[in-house]
Design a protein with these regions (language model features):
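Conserved AdoMet
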Residues: 2-121
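Residue-level signal for inorganic ion chemistry
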Residues: 100, 224, 249
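A structural alpha-helix within SAM-dependent methyltransferase catalytic domains
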Residues: 101, 135-139, 246
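Extended basic-aromatic, gly/pro-enriched interface segments that bind polyanionic ligands
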Residues: 123, 144-225, 229-240, 262-264, ...
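Conserved SAM-binding loop of SAM-dependent methyltransferases across substrates and taxa
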Residues: 127-145
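A short glycine-rich, Lys/Arg-flanked "PGG" loop and its adjoining helix->strand segment in the class I
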Residues: 239-251
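Conserved beta-strand signature within the Rossmann-like core of class I S-adenosyl-L-methionine
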Residues: 252-259
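Core SAM-dependent methyltransferase catalytic element
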Residues: 264-299
């Protein structure tokens, strides 16, 4: 018997008990690091009820059995898509892109012209507006960027949004947040909105990646954007994430985080605040974790 009455749908008599919610919350946190407090129970119920119905399951207990099973990997991804909201736009938190344009990118691109390797990472890229904004900023400073060793990695835990991001097709409303010169130079107008141009596409590699899992990247990053992602994690998970980022950054590299996020834990000692939610790796670069042969093969 549960401590509180189960949340239920009168039309179908499908209820979600406190025990069901606890199982779902554990699955989401174990798999994706996302913390679901009790206050989110109604939201979880309303969003996952659609999945229970679509699968023809009798109740949430059966749904929990599915997502907890080895055969439920695909449904765990569907569950994540149902529970997360991908709200973003081009050049969100413009001050970060101003910092890139004015201070961070000029020395990096100068080095790239001389043969240096430059790597940027949009971690939790959602539907792609962030990495494309990075590409536009790079191209505005170095139009021939694709001829140099400059690459942007864009990852998200949700394969469905990665597919949308890779497609690079956006609605007319998305035009409003792109500076006019960049809009004309780096996008193509379509009847319903815009298409990302080839110059920006050439700089970006999209890939699904769970930040709670292994990171099969080699080499160090010069810039990491991970904004409005860590807010879904509990404090210990956030601290581990900041430390892992620091371990993949070059000395002097920058980490940009969301407006409601703060660096805490061991990474505080090596990440110096240099602006609004902007941090620079100070001192010597942390040693990189050991990599497998397969990991070393991924650029």
């Amino acid at each position: 018997m549960t401590a509180t009455a189960p949340r239920s749908d009168p039309a179908t008599s499908i209820a979600m008990t406190t025990a069901d919610f606890g199982r779902i919350a554990r699955s989401v946190q174990d798999e994706f690091g996302i913390f679901l407090p009790e206050a989110k129970k109604d939201l979880v119920y309303s969003r996952l009820l659609k999945r229970v119905r679509a699968l023809g399951l009798p109740d949430f207990a059966a749904y929990c059995n599915l997502v907890e099973s080895p055969a439920g990997a695909g449904e765990r991804t569907e569950m994540l898509s149902a529970l997360t909201t991908n709200v973003t736009h081009f050049f969100r938190e413009m001050h970060h892109f101003d910092l890139l344009r004015d201070k961070v990118l000029p020395p990096l691109l100068h080095a790239a012209r001389k043969g240096a390797r430059v790597r940027l990472w949009s971690a939790g890229c959602s539907s792609g507006q962030e990495p494309y904004s990075l590409a536009f900023t790079v191209l505005s400073l170095l139009p021939e960027a694709a001829r140099h060793d400059i690459r942007i990695l864009a990852t998200d835990v949700d394969p469905q949004v990665i597919d949308r991001a890779r497609n690079g097709i956006y609605a007319a409303a998305d035009r409003d947040t792109i500076p006019a010169p960049m809009l004309s130079q780096f996008t193509d107008k379509t009847p319903d909105g815009l298409r990302i141009g080839d110059a920006a596409r050439a700089l970006i590699s999209f890939a699904p990646l769970n930040l709670m899992g292994d990171w099969p990247m080699r080499g160090a990053f010069d810039v990491i954007f991970c904004r409005n992602v860590a807010i879904y994690f509990d404090a210990p998970t956030q601290e581990r994430l900041w430390q892992r980022f620091a371990g993949l950054m070059r000395p002097g590299a920058h980490l940009l985080i969301g407006h409601s996020e703060r660096i805490a834990g061991p990474a505080e000692a090596s990440l110096e605040n240099v602006g609004i939610t902007a941090y620079r790796l100070a001192g010597q670069a942390p040693e990189k974790p050991n990599q497998t042969k397969a990991e070393r093969a991924i650029a």
